[in-house]
């Protein structure tokens, strides 16, 4: 589910020459989904997780009456970690264990309105990343200057990778906010048009009644005898 992280060519070449057996960087899991949950239904998802990883789950209700949903997050053992009712959005970060985590979106409380839901998963496996950094170091033991250079390169790569991941995360959230705001505006636009038409019809009917009543006041209802 994760995307591959590509390194600049000079860094890849340097690593190939100096560290022939070193492991590559492990990309973080960063996935987002948007789906429609019908009224009266519940949808659950399962995600396998490694040990001691950092999992962040963020969700938003983009469209639907009330913009609310019930959210449930459970551990591989079935223990409830998070349970929220009638929420429009939420962010949760947990340290994971080995196993499949379950998270559910529940719309059974609604009998009419379906909900459009966006959620994003971000997994940062810091344990494996630190181990890979140690694997890099053991191939350059005894070369202090080279060790310093490679550590600087590694630190720069991790910093750029973290910032790019954060930028992508923010852009995804901004798109979700924009979609929800657009849905709200379109809903308000439809309501304004509907009630404007109702007011127009009422005004026309009232005007017709007033004209009829005024006209009836000036009519001579007396019948002339022949």
Curated annotation (Swiss-Prot):
Q: Which InterPro entries match?
A: Emp24-like (IPR015720), GOLD_dom (IPR009038), GOLD_dom_sf (IPR036598)
* Signal peptide start-end: 1-24
Superkingdom, taxonomy of origin: Eukaryota
Q: Please give the residue ranges for the topological domain Lumenal.
A: 25-193
**Start and end residues of each GOLD domain:** 42-123
Does the record bear Ribonucleoprotein in its keywords? Answer: no
A matching Pfam family: EMP24_GP25L
For this entry, list what GO says about its biological process.
Answer: endoplasmic reticulum to Golgi vesicle-mediated transport; Golgi ribbon formation; intracellular protein transport
SUPFAM superfamilies linked: Supernatant protein factor (SPF), C-terminal domain
Which parts of the sequence lie on the Cytoplasmic side of the lipid bilayer?
Answer: 215-226
List the ranges annotated as motif Mediates export from ER.
217-218
Tell me the membrane topology, using the record's own terms.
Single-pass type I membrane protein
Q: Name one GO cellular component term.
A: endoplasmic reticulum membrane
Q: Which UniProt keywords apply?
A: Endoplasmic reticulum, Golgi apparatus, Membrane, Protein transport, Signal, Transmembrane, Transmembrane helix, Transport
Where, subcellularly, is it found?
Endoplasmic reticulum membrane; Golgi apparatus, cis-Golgi network membrane; Endoplasmic reticulum-Golgi intermediate compartment membrane
Q: How does it assemble?
A: Interacts with TMED9 and TMED10.
Q: What does this protein do?
A: Potential role in vesicular protein trafficking, mainly in the early secretory pathway. Required for the maintenance of the Golgi apparatus; involved in protein exchange between Golgi stacks during assembly. Probably not required for COPI-vesicle-mediated retrograde transport.
The record's comment on protein family reads: Belongs to the EMP24/GP25L family.
Protein name stated in the entry: Transmembrane emp24 domain-containing protein 5
Q: Which organism is it from?
A: Bos taurus (Bovine)
Upper taxonomic lineage: Eukaryota, Metazoa, Chordata, Craniata, Vertebrata
């Amino acid at each position: 589910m994760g995307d591959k992280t590509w390194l600049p060519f000079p860094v890849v070449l340097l690593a190939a020459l100096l560290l022939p057996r070193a492991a590559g960087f492990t990309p973080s899991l960063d996935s987002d989904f948007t789906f429609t949950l019908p009224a009266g239904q519940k949808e659950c998802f399962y995600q396998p997780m490694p040990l001691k990883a950092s999992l962040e789950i963020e969700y938003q209700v983009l469209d639907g009456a009330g913009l609310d949903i019930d959210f449930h997050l459970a551990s591989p053992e079935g223990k409830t970690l998070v349970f929220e009712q009638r929420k429009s959005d939420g962010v949760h970060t947990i340290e994971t264990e080995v196993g499949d985590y379950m998270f559910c979106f529940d719309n059974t409380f609604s009998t009419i309105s379906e909900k459009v839901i966006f959620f994003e998963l971000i997994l940062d496996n810091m344990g494996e990343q630190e181990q890979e950094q140690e694997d890099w170091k053991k191939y350059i033991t005894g070369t202090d200057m080279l060790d310093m250079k490679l550590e600087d390169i590694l630190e720069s790569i991790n910093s750029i990778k973290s910032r790019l991941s954060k930028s992508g995360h923010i852009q995804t959230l901004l798109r979700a906010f924009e979609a929800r705001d657009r849905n709200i505006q379109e809903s308000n636009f439809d309501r304004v048009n509907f009630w404007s038409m109702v007011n127009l019809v009422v005004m026309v009917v009232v005007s017709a009644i007033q004209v009829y009543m005024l006209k009836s006041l000036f009519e001579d209802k007396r019948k002339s005898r022949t």
